[in-house]
Amino acid sequence: MNKILVPTGYMGSGSSAVTDILAEIDGCSARDGDFEFVFLHCPNGVFDLEDKLLHGNNAIRSDEALHSFLGTMKQLCTKKYWWVGHYNEHVGPGFYDLCLRFVDELTFSRPNYYWYWQENTNARMFVELCIRKIVWLLTLKKVQLRKPRTYYDTMLSIPTEEEFYSAASRFISGVMDEIGLQEHNIVLDQLLLPHNLFRVDNYFGDELRVFEVSRDPRDVFIQNKYVWRSRNNAVVFPTDAEEFAQFYRRLRGSERPSGSAKVLKLQFEDLIYNYDASMEQIYAFLGVTKAQHSAPRTHFDPAKSIQNTQLSRANEQYAREAEIIAPYTEQYKSQYTDGVKRTIDFRSAPNVTNDCYFFRFAEKDGSKTVIIV
């Protein structure tokens, strides 16, 4: 059976290290690199649809849920310049047809009425309302055009849990086949997020393998503040140390544990300081042998990655901020406190260019440059 392999974690927590390790194992490389597949957990994605249809649903709420789902899925297919989109390329041309089939399977009635959500006036509707009024006046109130709406087809869906999960599982299976699961293993970065993992047994069979990677929150903070923000990338965490600490504790505390055998929890630091034992865990989880790890340390090299740990040791500023964070996040801290000869001071790393989980140093024009690979 081919596998769906999903590296996931918290921004800057090291899940790309797993993607790199998988690339070293026969038959496990990622066709789409670090492209993030979001159709399950994005706003108005499959999981939002689940929550709307199975919790607090009613006759008109389901109509909004189905239309919002289809609208977002269509944007993922067709919207230009949206980096999470382009599903016609990353998934396949049949993706939106699968979405339509999924919604059709969930819809039990298409009544001939409308509700206030469909009357939320936009620019197109305003023009149509003006035309409607003019026609009504010119015909001496004899001709009344159809009242404009945001959309005209009302869809009702009040599924049981079994009906919803069965339809959703068929939909996801179709998407996976569109990507190529029938031919080979597929690696889908961030298909699931840590906060969604309690749901996986409702949607997937034994073909799923999720690698949930966490990391010392002090290093997550330093990486986000001094790498991502310096590159003008969106940073999802606060960059004030105390605010980050409270945010991170609440974020992790809000997670519902999954307990699924389809999920392997990994600590980024273990992949480095306890490499051999971590690899044995990964082999067992994947059902592969060590011999199938045919190119070890060619994509992920713990000897290099160690420089990307214990970052608070790089300078006094990092150390002060890490000291503020530590009391709030004791249960998430790394157990490793030594073994690092040199860590990265991101303030003096001028050419930070890509998602970084390990580093190499290169000489360029006689000066030392940090290159992130």
Which residue stretches match the model-derived regions?
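PAPS-dependent sulfotransferase catalytic core
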Residues: M1-E162, P302
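A polyampholytic, Gly/Pro-enriched intrinsically disordered region
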Residues: E50-R61, R231-A241, S312-R320
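A generic structural motif
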Residues: D32-F35, S214, H293-H299
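PAPS-dependent sulfotransferase catalytic domain
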Residues: F108-H293, A362, G366-I372
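Short aromatic-enriched loop/helix-cap "lid" or pocket-rim segments at secondary-structure transitions
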Residues: H41-F47, Q223-Y226, A277-M279, Q307-T309
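Noncatalytic linker/hinge segments flanking ATPase motor cores
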Residues: F47-D51, T72-L76, V227-A234, R250-S260, ...
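PAPS-dependent sulfotransferases, especially Golgi type II membrane carbohydrate sulfotransferases
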Residues: M1-L5, Y114, V135, R252-K262, ...
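Short secondary-structure junctions and interdomain/linker hinges
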Residues: I60, K80, L106-Y113, K141, ...
